[in-house]
Amino acid sequence: MPFEQISWLQDVREYRRVAKNRKALREPGKGTDYTHERFRDAVNRVVARIHPKRMNLRVKEILPQTAAAKTFCFERVDGPLPPFRAGQYVNVMVTVEGVRTSRPYSISSAPGAQRLELTLRNKPEGFVAPYLFNTLKVGDVLETTGPAGHFYYEPLIDGEDLVFLAGGSGITPFMSMIRDAIQQQLPLKIHLLYGCRMPEDVIFKSELEMLAAHHPGLTFSPVLSEPPDGYEGLKGFLDSTLMERLVGDVKGKTFYLCGPRVMHDFCVAALKELKVPQRKIRQELYGAPEDVSQEPGWPEGLSGDMVFEVEVAEKKMILARAGEPLLNALERGGLKLPALCRSGECSACRIRLLTGKVFVPSQAKVRESDRKAGYIHSCVSYPVGNLKIRM
């Protein structure tokens, strides 16, 4: 057994042993040889290993997937890899053009693997993805958060008949889920519908075809929106007609969505046509809309290029464009905020809005308690005037 696993088990045994003495530790004169500090330290050590706030990951191997996608295989250099749920992500911290920022990337490897894999698709119009795709090499070390997110299989809630709707690089959490389900021999029926533009855009194509051929519980249906002449596979978009044709009766099925925002809007509308209950639709959204000015409710006549002043707790003034998330402007101004999902769900980047107004897309998952307390999630908040905030 590797040393890291032995050390981990020792920490778990330590925790279980001292946990039995918690009551005695609180009663003077009845304690064991353990002190409160030793108990606390043992618990904290286990928690830090299982749920690390930060990790340093070294690139061990780079696997080409398509012309525009690569899988980066990492080993952890500051401890053992923590456990995670298939479908979770890590947030990668980088400095690009002098700006310290971060982006969440789904883990594509299965839990329990000897290395952690992130599969990235190059987006020329992006900021972080092109930097990682074009500069990251074997031996480089990245700082990331520990695994996070709630986009994973819940057996007691989701049942055993699952439909995965993927688009582009949104295939990555599903690869982790599929690999995990097969390795654990879970009694699941999985329908994977994968929307791409052209045949060369299908990530993991060979592996998915092989897995579907050897596991009757998995069906794999790539759907191309811009197929070449003579293509005999599925064509078009993941609309209600195609879904019903491929998965049959939707009753009792749980639908998972991961892909571009435009795909989410399209697929959610299709699922509503099929009368799929909202509780049976699970979504994973990363990042901000590509063009927030096209979102419902955007102020009429406001250009996304309009620039506003943002005063940060009477200490600093920065400039922010209406068409970019406030978090991006704060990072560009040299301010450090914690961030995870960058889609409004986790609330890690919340700040207090003192004066001014922001636009928040309707699909952003902002907690009602934060709204009432005057907090905004900076990753999904867009200035529509001058602001004053407190971090």
Regions found by a protein language model. Give the residues of each.
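Phosphate-handling active-site elements
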Residues: 182-189, 356-365
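A short, compositionally biased
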Residues: 86-88, 301-308, 345-347, 383
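FNR/FR-type flavoprotein reductase catalytic core
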Residues: 1-17, 130-312
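Ferredoxin-reductase
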Residues: 42-141, 145, 160-161, 196-198, ...
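Iron-sulfur (Fe-S) cluster-binding modules
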Residues: 1-51, 273, 278, 300, ...
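C-terminal accessory/binding modules appended to enzymatic or scaffolding proteins
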Residues: 304-345, 354
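Local cysteine-cluster metal-coordination motifs and their immediate loop/turn environment
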Residues: 173, 331, 335-362, 370-385
